Structure formats: structure tokens, C-alpha cells
Amino acid sequence: MLTFDHILIRYGELALKGKNRHMFEKQLVQNIRSVLKPSFPRLTYHRTFGRILLGLNGEDPLPIKDKLRKIFGIHSFSLAIRVTNELDKMKQAALHALQASEGEVKTFKINARRAYKPFPISSSELNHHLGGYVLANTEQISVDVHSPDVEIKVEVRESGTYIMTGEFKGLGGLPVGTSGKVLLMLSGGIDSPVAGYYLLKRGVTLEAIHFHSPPFTNEKAKQKVVDLAAKLTNFGGQVKLHIVPFTELQKHIHEKVPSNMEMTIMRRMMLRISEGIAKKTDALAIATGESLGQVASQTLHSMNTINEVTTTPVLRPLLTMDKEEVITVAKEIDTFNISILPYEDCCTIFLPPDSKTKPTRQQAKKFEQFVETEAYVQTAIEGTETMVIKSEAAVSKTEMDELL
């Protein structure tokens, strides 16, 4: 009995990776397996040139499709019928695939691809053979090579022939784990989780750092950040979250620095602490959710002054995006409703009404003379707590008790 018993996975950008292609493909298979294996133990995984083939072995394809849609590195995928490389079997499978198509079907097209060159029939000949068979065994259906109701894709490979009629879009990008580690400054707002999402899309392994200032920021604010990190695990596996005690340093800055320079000095301190954590965790870069000109601390002048304190690259994935664009993505990845919960983070307390939009490095150095920078930064790094979030449901009660 013919049935859709495989999923054929395509990847786009990986095909351009030359000699490193094997490494990218291997990581993608590993990521797919780690996502699917716990819930679908009967799946089999086979990597062939330009494709990954999942054998369903009786598993329900619908929930598998939902999970594949969230794995970076996948360009698209299709449900497929696999048959042996025999013309009669291909004809029967093509007809079955058409008959199983949903909706009204009046026109079709065969699109055959002979990836296995020893197969004696060319792609164009296959189109004619299979198309003729489908026409002879259906009524009131015709061929339309330009805009068909159903396109029957046929791929002949060494392991068999795969017949498909639909295609589901993936997220694209690179497989998570192929681009090194990045430490994301996760504030709890709308922007930084979206920045994390785009970093994952470029294949980074993500860790996050959050600055917590109790009692000015409460435990609900901390839980909010944990929940945001958990949302990011849907796209990139586990996330290590580093919680930095920031109260004493923030109070110290508030006491010693003029209000219009507080934000600049605070951001410089955050960057110093982040660099310290990045070095301890072997992160190659720090990332923020900053967008150029959005607030006073995100002008080019501010960024130039704040960046002075680190030699670690600072990535800003959202730099050129409008707020509305960011909000749209936040809703798509399901972080928006968490981000807008009304719990203050450390950047909103002691918020001065007159922050400088063009602070200079000289001004920052002048006022940092009154701040015990090294001692406070080291204390914050040493007091940092770390938790591992493996999925939305993986923050156990014990972990939360330790966190709170």
C-alpha cells in the first residue's frame, strides 16, 4: 500500500559552504534528531547529497512538521512517498500522490529530478512517462506546466525515488551550533529576545546574561526573563542564563554620577561585566537588542562611548530595524506578550529624564573616576548565578527555588 512514509528536507544556504558543507549538514542532522527523537523514537535519519531523509515508520507527520518549522538551517521540506527505482512503481506513486492532494485539482505538472545519474531514464523522459500515466488514469484533469493546481515533484536517488506534492517553508539560516557562542544581554524588553532569535538564525550557540537589581526589580521581573529565555529554546535548544546581582553597583553609580551620565556609565559597567562572563564561558561576542537612535543610549555617539570599555565584539542584530518590525517578529516567535508584562528591569529604575544623547569618552572617563569600577565589576561577576533552560517546560521547581 502506497503511503507518505518519508519527509524530505532541503537546505539552501548550506549548499554554498564548499569544503565545510559536511560540517554544516552533520550539525543540522544532529539538531533535527535532538528535537525529534524524544517524541518520535521510530524516526530514522539519512543524510544524502543536498537532502536529509526522515523515515516516518508509522509516526504521525503533523506534529513533526510543526517542530521542523522551528529548526534553523531548513529551507523547506515535503511529505514523500518512497518507492524503489522502478518506472512502474513511480507511475503508481505519482498517481496516488495526485489523488491524495487536497482541494479541487484540474491541472497538474510532473517535475522530475534525476539525482542518481546511473538511473537510465532522463528527467525529461520521466516527466513524459509519469505525466502520461497520470493522464491515462484520471478524468477531467490536464497538464499545465506554468501554473498547475498540483506540482508532483519526483526525486530519483540511490536509496529510492521520492514523490511529493506539497512543500512547507522552513526558517532558513544556518544550523545552531555552527557559528560559535554569543552572550546575549537579555533585558526582559521586546527587543533583546528578537535579537536572540536572529542570532540563532545565523547558527550561534546562545547564552544570555541578565542584570537583576532587587528589591528595585522583583522576582516576577526575573521570572519574566527566564520565560523569555525558555521561548528562545524553541529555536535553538538549551540556553544558559546568567543572573548578575546589579543592585549595589547601580546604587553606587546613582550616588556618584550626574543623572545625565548615569545611563552611559551603567551601560559601560554592564559591558565590562558581560565581557568578564563572556571570557569565562568562551563566548566570542556579546550581543544586544539595540536599534540605532531608538533611545538616548542607542545613538551612535552613545554606542561609541559605551563600546570603549571592551575589546570583545558587540553584535547588534536589530540595529537598522524599526520598532514595528521588531514587534512583528516578537509576536511571531511568541515573546511579545511576555516582554510587555509590567515588571521593571534594571534599565528602567533610576531612569534620568535628561540622559545625554552625545556622551563622549572623555566625559565617561571623567565621571568613572568617582566609581570603584574594578571592585564592583568583579563582585558582580563572582556573584553571578547560572541556570540551564532546556525548554519551555524544563525549568524545574528545584531550579526555580534556587533562582528565587
From Swiss-Prot:
Listed PROSITE patterns: THUMP
Enzyme class: transferase
Keyword Metal-binding among UniProt keywords: no
Highest taxon of the lineage: Bacteria
NCBIfam families attached to this UniProt entry: tRNA uracil 4-sulfurtransferase ThiI
Protein name: Probable tRNA sulfurtransferase
Occurrences of domain THUMP (ranges): 62-167
Gene Ontology terms, MF aspect: ATP binding; CCA tRNA nucleotidyltransferase activity; tRNA binding; tRNA-uracil-4 sulfurtransferase activity
